């Protein structure tokens, strides 16, 4: 930890790996998304390890779910996105895959939220856009956001950039982040490393630092 102008400046991962400084964000680990990702089961397993480590020390946990609006509430942007993802040129062929109570929208059973976890539904790619996430983090005095889930190139990179713009420090658990397109996911990870504002690590390192923070006097 460094200091400037009387303020702490976290520079090492260990500076943020404790229950007071950081929250764990599990991004869009939904039944209908897991099945679209190569290696989805592996990402679930890695997220589960991170989640168990966070819960063991009482770290705050937040889940996001991507929603689709009913067609009556789909506007131009939502139709354009859905047409792209569903590989159709006709708006009439679009199906709202992730309606609020649809089975595909549910969090995967291996990672079910508890009553102590925050679950936020969103329409945008960034976990901060249109949700109270930033307010909730600031209200709890949280600086760091450890992020895992699916997909790196679709929503995790935008969330990381948005987090930095809002004054939070993103921690990317790289081996717990899946991608729908391997090359695009790799480019996103390389871009985040190049920009340098996010801390990039792996789940086992993160879990070990959490355990150490809990056992330290």
Predicted segment positions?
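A short alpha/beta connector and helix-capping loop motif
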Residues: 20, 38-54, 58-67
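Short acidic, Gly/Ser-rich segments with clustered Asp/Glu that frequently serve as metal-coordination loops
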Residues: 30-35
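Active-site-adjacent betaalpha module
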Residues: 1-23, 49-52, 56-57, 74, ...
């Amino acid at each position: 930890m460094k200091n400037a102008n009387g303020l702490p400046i976290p520079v090492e991962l260990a500076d943020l790996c404790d229950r007071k400084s950081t929250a764990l964000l599990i991004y869009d680990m939904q039944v209908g998304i897991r099945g679209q990702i190569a290696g989805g089961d592996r990402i679930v397993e890695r997220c589960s390890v991170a989640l168990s480590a966070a819960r063991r020390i009482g770290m705050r946990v937040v889940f996001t779910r991507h929603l689709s609006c009913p067609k009556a509430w789909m506007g131009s942007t939502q139709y354009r996105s859905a047409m792209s993802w569903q590989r159709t040129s006709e708006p009439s062929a679009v199906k709202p895959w992730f309606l609020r109570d649809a089975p595909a929208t549910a969090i995967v059973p291996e990672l079910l939220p508890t009553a102590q976890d925050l679950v936020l539904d969103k329409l945008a790619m960034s976990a901060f856009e249109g949700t109270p996430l930033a307010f909730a983090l600031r209200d709890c005095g949280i600086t760091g956001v450890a992020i895992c889930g699916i997909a790196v190139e679709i929503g995790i990179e935008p969330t990381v950039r948005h987090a930095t713009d809002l004054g939070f420090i993103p921690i990317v658990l790289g081996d717990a982040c899946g991608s729908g397109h391997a090359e695009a996911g790799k480019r996103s990870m390389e871009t985040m490393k190049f920009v340098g504002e996010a801390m990039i690590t792996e789940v086992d390192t993160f879990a070990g630092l959490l355990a150490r923070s809990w056992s330290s006097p």
